[in-house]
């Protein structure tokens, strides 16, 4: 780049001199020719770039990666603002105007590098004398140049009136403010490096330095905007730097107020850490990495640090260094309750506690139903009524038929009351309530649509797997459809598990099987009446007929005297029909043989 620009410049100058053959006509020809001026501008920019690299080597040595990144980032914004300034001052556009803006951008770059290099002093433990010499020489040179250009702009405005020098005067005044802040930071860092122990008040001085310089920048930008609007036009190129200056000043004010509040809370609200607390925990302060023997404070989050370390920390941020808890919010005292709030709290305590319905006893090894709302796809269902034919309440006592019937009656009354009190009861023949009776009324379009089940459940084929591989739109849609199918299957499985557990809870544990004696009575009535053997007569009028839905029936009363006279006082046993018939036939044959 350097060689090409140098060759182009030499060729242009040689061509102009070849045409004019004299120095003055050659200079006039170069200044009037647009292509020649463009090549000369390029050569001037190359020379400025080379001068900047040389001065960077002299004052900074090797630039760090962070410094180069910040320089490039700020340079792009500065070039954009310079182009906007060219549009505002298009009437004053000239080679001298371009040279002044180029020089301003050149000096801005060195101001930014000086600021980054001084900030590096706080993170570097070893600072050489060469570093101090370079920084002091650079700050002295930049300060002298800023003061010179400010005085030059002032004299130009006084003698010639409002011109483009107004912009350069305010720009160099702001650069003077920046170099002043850099110099104060350099002094503070140098004092801190010379002391053996960390300087606690350095953060305080740096905070007030930023507050002071930020206030000066805001005043300068406001004055510059006011003057430019009155004498020329609205300075569009100054909007971004003025906004950044105001934001920085606002941040400095907020940091100053919040840091003072945090330090006041630390001195008044936070207790000192005792020796037992220091021994019970790791007594190394994570801010300075030194052991805490005395002079430690315990924050509301129970983390302990040096008091001096906390004071320096709170100058920048008001959070716990370990857990990032906001110490200002945690330190707010509780507000006393007003009489109205106390009365409302007293009334809330006097209100009766709502009675929670008892949970049903689930069989061993079974899980209770899932709570409503766990799966948002399915709305919560109402209370399930007992399944028809299932025992209600406790199982009846076989030894006490009266208590069984009484408990059955009470259970029936309870079920009637429950069915009246719950509108979402199940319809006859259905073990579950209707889906829309046991749930609250939703707003329009409030119920999500039921998803369509997947086409198959045997797994994904090779074609479906290949359809999901890739990063195109159809591959993404295939993966989303697969996830939707999985979500549908999981919701359906959870619903069926909930229904299954509800049915198990309603039917209760299994009861021992009890056979009915009605079949034996029917078989006894079919025996021939011409037999000479006296068959046992059962008093059917005293049999209590029970409903088929009940699991246990009352004992059937029989004529014990008749049975005793015929069979020697034996009580009939509940046996199957074929065994009873066989026994009776054997008795009949034995009676016939004896006669």
Swiss-Prot record:
Pathway: Protein modification; protein ubiquitination
Membrane-spanning parts: 1-19, 36-56, 93-113, 130-150, 164-184, 219-239
Localization in the cell: Endoplasmic reticulum membrane
Coiled coil (residue ranges): 463-494
Comp. bias intervals (Low complexity): 335-353, 390-408, 514-552
Positions on the Lumenal side per record topology: 20-35, 114-129, 185-218
GO CC, alphabetical: endomembrane system; endoplasmic reticulum membrane; endoplasmic reticulum quality control compartment
SUPFAM superfamilies noted in UniProt: RING/U-box
Any one GO MF annotation of this record: zinc ion binding
Membrane topology field: Multi-pass membrane protein
Keywords: Coiled coil, Endoplasmic reticulum, Membrane, Metal-binding, Transferase, Transmembrane, Transmembrane helix, Ubl conjugation pathway, Zinc, Zinc-finger
Catalytic activity: S-ubiquitinyl-[E2 ubiquitin-conjugating enzyme]-L-cysteine + [acceptor protein]-L-lysine = [E2 ubiquitin-conjugating enzyme]-L-cysteine + N(6)-ubiquitinyl-[acceptor protein]-L-lysine
Biological process annotations from GO: ERAD pathway; proteasome-mediated ubiquitin-dependent protein catabolic process; protein ubiquitination; ubiquitin-dependent protein catabolic process
Highest taxon of the lineage: Eukaryota
Region (Disordered): 335-370, 386-426, 509-595
All ranges on the Cytoplasmic side of the membrane: 57-92, 151-163, 240-595
Interaction with p53/TP53: region residues: 230-264
Binding site for Zn(2+) 2: 301, 303, 320, 323
Zinc finger (RING-type): 285-324
Residues that, per the record, bind Zn(2+) 1: 285, 288, 306, 309
InterPro entries: HRD1_E3_ubiq-ligases (IPR050731), Znf_RING (IPR001841), Znf_RING/FYVE/PHD (IPR013083)
Domain observations: The RING-type zinc finger is required for E3 ligase activity.
Family: Belongs to the HRD1 family.
Quaternary organization: Homodimer.
Protein name: E3 ubiquitin-protein ligase synoviolin B
Source organism (scientific name): Xenopus laevis
């Amino acid at each position: 780049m350097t060689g090409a620009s140098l060759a182009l410049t030499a060729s242009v100058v040689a061509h102009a001199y070849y045409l004019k053959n004299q120095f003055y006509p050659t200079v006039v020809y170069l200044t009037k020719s647009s292509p020649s001026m463009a090549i000369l501008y390029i050569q001037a920019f190359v020379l400025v770039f080379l001068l900047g690299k040389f001065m960077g080597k002299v004052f900074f040595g090797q630039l760090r990666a962070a410094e180069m990144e910040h320089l490039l980032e700020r340079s792009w914004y500065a070039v954009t603002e310079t182009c906007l300034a060219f549009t505002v001052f298009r009437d004053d556009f000239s080679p001298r105007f371009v040279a002044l803006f180029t020089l301003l951008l050149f000096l801005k770059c060195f101001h930014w590098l000086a600021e980054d290099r001084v900030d590096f002093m706080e993170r570097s433990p070893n600072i050489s004398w060469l570093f101090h010499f370079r920084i002091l020489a650079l700050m002295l040179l930049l300060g002298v140049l800023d003061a010179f250009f400010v005085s030059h702009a002032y004299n130009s405005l006084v003698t010639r009136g409002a011109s483009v020098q107004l912009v350069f005067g305010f720009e160099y005044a702001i650069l003077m403010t920046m170099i002043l802040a850099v110099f104060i930071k350099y002094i503070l860092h140098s004092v801190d490096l010379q002391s053996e122990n960390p300087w606690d008040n350095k953060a305080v001085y740096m905070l007030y330095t930023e507050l002071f310089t930020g206030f000066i920048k805001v005043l300068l930008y406001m004055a510059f905007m006011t003057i430019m609007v009155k004498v020329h036009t609205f300075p569009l190129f100054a909007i971004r730097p003025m906004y950044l200056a105001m934001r920085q000043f606002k941040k400095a004010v907020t940091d100053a107020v919040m840091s003072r509040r945090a330090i006041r809370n630390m001195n008044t609200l936070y207790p000192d850490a005792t020796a037992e607390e220091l021994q019970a925990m790791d007594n190394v302060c994570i801010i300075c990495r030194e052991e805490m023997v005395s002079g430690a404070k315990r924050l509301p989050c129970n983390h302990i640090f040096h008091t001096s370390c906390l004071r320096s920390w709170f100058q920048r941020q008001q959070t716990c260094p370990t857990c990032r808890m906001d110490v200002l919010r945690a330190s707010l005292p509780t507000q006393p309750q007003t009489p109205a709030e106390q009365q409302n709290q007293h009334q809330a305590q006097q209100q009766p506690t709502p009675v929670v319905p008892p949970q049903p006893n689930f069989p061993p090894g079974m899980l209770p139903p899932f709570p409503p709302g766990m799966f948002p796809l399915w709305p919560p269902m109402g209370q399930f009524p007992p399944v028809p034919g299932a025992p209600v309440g406790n199982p009846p006592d076989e030894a006490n038929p009266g208590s069984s019937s009484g408990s059955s009656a009470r259970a029936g009354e309870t079920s009637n009351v429950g069915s009246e009190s719950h509108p979402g009861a199940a319809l006859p023949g259905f073990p579950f309530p209707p889906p829309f009776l046991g749930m609250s009324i939703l707003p329009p379009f409030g119920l999500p649509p039921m998803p369509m089940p997947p086409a198959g459940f045997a797994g994904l084929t090779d074609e479906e797997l290949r359809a999901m591989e890739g990063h195109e739109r159809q591959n993404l849609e295939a993966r989303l459809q697969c996830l939707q199918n999985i979500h549908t299957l999981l919701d359906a499985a959870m619903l069926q598990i909930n229904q299954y557990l509800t049915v198990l809870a309603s039917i209760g544990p299994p009861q021992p099987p009890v056979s009915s004696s009605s079949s034996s009575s029917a078989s006894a009535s079919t025996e021939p009446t011409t037999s000479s053997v006296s068959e046992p007569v059962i008093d059917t009028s005293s049999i209590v007929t029970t409903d088929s839905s009940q699991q246990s029936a009352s004992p059937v009363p029989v004529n014990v005297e008749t049975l005793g006279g015929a069979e020697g006082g034996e009580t009939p046993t509940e046996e199957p029909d074929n065994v009873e018939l066989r026994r009776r036939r054997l008795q009949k044959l034995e009676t016939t043989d004896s006669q």
